[in-house]
């Protein structure tokens, strides 16, 4: 019984010692991140699609902080370019990708050809494809960014990019863009003057 207690005590002592060493090392060898990179990364849409030429949003944020162009993110669009220009103190540029007149496209899986290999699921950076191994897959069109990274890995070519028609149901309404002001609260004197005139 005493040998078990000695072994448990020795393991606890070693765990405490290694924990203290790791704690000290994490403080002593801490790598400071550039705060501008974190701010740029927060503005980017985090689709990790690679259309900018970088493997994800964080590497692109680091490249922008080092002087790369701010107009390479198609999912972010012009709004992201303007936010980045404001943050970086530069003039907003037009998108490097010709998005004028282009209809947004989303992936569509022809389910009769799908073999359930899950290669498209692994390639999708935003988890817009659902399905399981040896089961049919489908695309959640509201989540799809149209990056077409899922098309190339498909061994049966059952994925195609189809245009998403803009309707009143699919339009991205920006309800906060137009401020709603209650006139009676905005100008309380006008209500009392109307009452006095009557």
From Swiss-Prot:
Chain sites annotated for binding [4Fe-4S] cluster 3: 124, 144, 147, 150
Listed cofactors: [4Fe-4S] cluster
Gene Ontology biological process terms from the UniProt entry: electron transport chain
Region (Hydrophobic): 1-26
Cofactor note: Binds 3 [4Fe-4S] clusters.
GO cellular component: plasma membrane
Keyword hit for Cell membrane: yes
Domain 4Fe-4S ferredoxin-type: 105-134, 135-164
Residues in 4Fe-4S domain copies: 32-90
Record keywords, A-Z: 4Fe-4S, Cell inner membrane, Cell membrane, Electron transport, Iron, Iron-sulfur, Membrane, Metal-binding, Repeat, Translocase, Transport
Locations listed in the record: Cell inner membrane
PROSITE patterns to which the protein is assigned, alphabetical: 4FE4S, 4FE4S_FER_1, 4FE4S_FER_2
Main localization (coarse): membrane
UniProt EC number: 7.-.-.-
NCBIfam families: PRK05113.1, rnfB
Subunit structure: The complex is composed of six subunits: RnfA, RnfB, RnfC, RnfD, RnfE and RnfG.
Protein name per its UniProtKB record: Ion-translocating oxidoreductase complex subunit B
Organism, as annotated: Vibrio vulnificus (strain YJ016)
Gene that this sequence comes from: rnfB
